[in-house]
């Protein structure tokens, strides 16, 4: 039997987090695929924020958590979502992290970090035990070691301001 409707794990985790943390908000699931995975409205349903959700399992249980994504740059550029939400559950601390940012800023950073030689962008977002967030694809072992000891510095690769950054959604729904 084929299900009529399903949501993926990342959408579920985002929706569950919102309903637990912001019980006054409403979470909606669109009935057709338009590039918007979840719609979040304020209590009166007068203001809305659209989310594109990307999920990855944790690939590094020892050093915080690391997720891997493969993006199409054209989809990011054409995205109608207000925010992209990267969902990264951690093996080590049993907590789910959310990296939340507008698609325009995401694409700007990817261009600065990886260039735009092709239309596919592979991304490794890493959350350290000290709650810093980095785009680490393409870095050598020395830089990865610096990330692990909280000594690395690169403005474009530093995604910490977007780590669990629900306040930007709160502002839009006020």
Predicted feature locations:
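Mixed-charge (Asp/Glu-Lys/Arg
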Residues: 1-34, 39-174
